[in-house]
Amino acid sequence: MNLNATILGQAIAFVLFVLFCMKYIWPPIMAAIEKRQKEIADGLSSAERAKKDLDLAQANATDQLKKAKAEAQVIIEQASKRKAQILDEAKAEAEQERNKIVAQAQAEIDAERKRAREELRKQVAMLAIAGAEKIIERSVDEAANSDIVDKLVAEL
């Protein structure tokens, strides 16, 4: 009978041990396991949200980069057009200035040419009078001289 009492005692001790474990040890272990499961689930959902946010941020960054490239292209085109406009304006202004300078130079040349012709006519007239005086060997008065010079200038 010894054997039966020992088994019965061990069975009672085991039942008490199981009851003790179910009451005092099992609930904290289950709470810790459930807490850890919840933390893992939260971490996974947080990682999922972070991945979605990252994808959204990358899409936004790509869109902004495309917009920036488009704006840069527009700015480059505007700058190129402005450069061409400035060059055209500068060329037109330079052409006007050149034409103005050429016109002024031509006017100065014409005025100098007229003045030189007048001077030459007067000198030719004076030489002609001097030659005529020497040939005639007489002196012509100043009023007659002036009339002769004017007639010669008009003829030349």
Swiss-Prot record:
Keyword Cell inner membrane: yes
Protein family (similarity comment): Belongs to the ATPase B chain family.
Pfam families reported for this sequence: ATP-synt_B
NCBIfam families, A to Z: ATP_synt_b, PRK05759.1-2, PRK05759.1-4
Cellular compartments per GO CC: plasma membrane; proton-transporting ATP synthase complex
InterPro entries referenced in this protein's UniProt entry, alphabetically: ATP_synth_B-like_membr_sf (IPR028987), ATP_synth_b/b'su_bac/chlpt (IPR002146), ATP_synth_F0_bsu_bac (IPR005864), ATP_synthase_B_chain (IPR050059)
Protein name: ATP synthase subunit b
Transmembrane spans: 11-31
GO molecular-function terms, A-Z: proton-transporting ATP synthase activity, rotational mechanism; proton-transporting ATPase activity, rotational mechanism
Subcellular location: Cell inner membrane
Assembly and interaction partners: F-type ATPases have 2 components, F(1) - the catalytic core - and F(0) - the membrane proton channel. F(1) has five subunits: alpha(3), beta(3), gamma(1), delta(1), epsilon(1). F(0) has three main subunits: a(1), b(2) and c(10-14). The alpha and beta chains form an alternating ring which encloses part of the gamma chain. F(1) is attached to F(0) by a central stalk formed by the gamma and epsilon chains, while a peripheral stalk is formed by the delta and b chains.
Keywords: ATP synthesis, Cell inner membrane, Cell membrane, CF(0), Hydrogen ion transport, Ion transport, Membrane, Transmembrane, Transmembrane helix, Transport
Membrane topology qualifier: Single-pass membrane protein
Function, in words: F(1)F(0) ATP synthase produces ATP from ADP in the presence of a proton or sodium gradient. F-type ATPases consist of two structural domains, F(1) containing the extramembraneous catalytic core and F(0) containing the membrane proton channel, linked together by a central stalk and a peripheral stalk. During catalysis, ATP synthesis in the catalytic domain of F(1) is coupled via a rotary mechanism of the central stalk subunits to proton translocation.
